[in-house]
Swiss-Prot record:
Coiled coil feature spans: none
Subunit structure as annotated in this protein's UniProt entry: F-type ATPases have 2 components, CF(1) - the catalytic core - and CF(0) - the membrane proton channel. CF(1) has five subunits: alpha(3), beta(3), gamma(1), delta(1), epsilon(1). CF(0) has three main subunits: a, b and c.
Organism (species): Helicobacter acinonychis (strain Sheeba)
GO molecular function terms attached to this record: ATP binding; proton-transporting ATP synthase activity, rotational mechanism
Name used for this protein in its record: ATP synthase gamma chain
Function, in words: Produces ATP from ADP in the presence of a proton gradient across the membrane. The gamma chain is believed to be important in regulating ATPase activity and the flow of protons through the CF(0) complex.
Keywords, alphabetical: ATP synthesis, Cell inner membrane, Cell membrane, CF(1), Hydrogen ion transport, Ion transport, Membrane, Transport
SUPFAM superfamilies according to UniProt: ATP synthase (F1-ATPase), gamma subunit
InterPro entries with a match to the protein in the record: ATP_synth_F1_ATPase_gsu (IPR035968), ATP_synth_F1_gsu (IPR000131)
Pfam families registered for this protein in UniProt: ATP-synt
Length: 301
């Protein structure tokens, strides 16, 4: 009977867990719909901003303007990279499958790749899970912020990027890369690595799919070339981080929805197996009692 009580307790415990994971799945599904819409709208703006850059750079190139003084712009092929800053974005919470682990693995892989080329790497972290991992393993993270990935905010992203841009313009780093998990569809997330500084004539190809058409910007900007580029570059860099945060959040909700759906299904299977074990143990207990009764009756004859 003790075994039966234990199995009943396990069944009750698993059913309670199943209710929790199912509720979390519903919450993540609801949040995902909202995050997906925001990400879709933000991506449209990001692609438009990319188109502006690409058009301005094309016009300057066609006009023979090669000596761009703006420090935001460099040709990566001609630039000797000695120092790289990696901005990584992870979630503040867990229970989202391999979402955080995949991002961390990519950060470590990129770090090793750069270091093998004698390139110094500095990390800047957004997201509690990633920051905790690197802190636990004794890996220095220059800037840490823990509640921005779960609540993307343009002003805070702008503030975070100020120090990054300042270090870049002052020559403390030669290249800035963002690594995060991106939303592809309801069931697929993909790791994205994007170079945001320096900016070269590669923006459209780096950020969009071949099927995504870009509009040509026909308006003529006023002001010097460097002033125009500096103004656009500042907006581009800030929005690149903001969009990455939005994209990462949508991917996080997608991953958590899948993880909770899997956990719920596993709980159902476990309850089914435990119920079979319970019924089998109950039948064995009844059979044992009947045998004992029959043995007692035979002994009295």
């Amino acid at each position: 009977m003790a075994n039966l009580r234990d199995i009943r307790k396990k069944i009750g415990s698993v059913k309670n867990t199943q209710k929790i994971t199912h509720a979390m799945k519903l919450v993540s599904t609801s949040k995902l719909r909202k995050a997906e819409e925001v990400a879709r709208n933000s991506r449209a703006y990001a692609l438009k901003l990319d188109a502006v850059f690409d058009d301005v750079l094309s016009k300057m190139k066609n006009q023979g303007i090669k000596d761009i003084q703006s420090k935001y712009f460099r040709e990566l092929e001609r630039l000797e990279i000695k120092k790289v800053d990696i901005i990584f974005i992870t979630a503040d919470k867990g229970l989202c499958g391999g979402f955080n682990a995949n991002t961390i693995k990519k950060v470590l892989a990129c770090t090793n790749e750069y270091q093998e080329k004698d390139i110094k790497v500095r990390l800047r972290g957004i997201g509690k899970k990633g920051n905790e991992y690197f802190s636990f393993n004794g890996i220095e993270v220059l800037d840490k912020i823990n509640d921005l990935s779960s609540m993307p905010n343009y002003e805070r992203a702008q503030e975070f990027m100020q120090k990054v841009v300042e270090d870049y313009l002052n020559g403390k780093t030669d290249k800035v890369v963002i690594i995060h998990n991106g939303f592809k569809n309801m069931i697929i997330q993909e790791i994205r690595v994007k170079t945001i500084l320096p900016i070269g004539h590669h923006i459209i190809h780096q950020n969009s799919q071949p099927s995504e058409a870009q509009e040509t910007i026909t308006s003529e900007p006023s002001g010097s070339e460097d002033e125009i580029l500096d103004s656009l570059a500042k907006k581009y860099v800030e929005y690149s981080l903001y969009y990455a945060l939005i994209d990462s959040l949508a991917a996080e909700h997608s991953a958590r929805m899948q993880a909770m759906d899997t956990a719920t299904n596993n709980a159902k299977d476990l309850v089914k197996n435990l119920t079979i074990s319970y019924n089998k143990a109950r039948q064995e207990a009844i059979t044992t009692e009947l045998v004992e009764i029959n043995a007692g009756v035979e002994a009295l004859k």
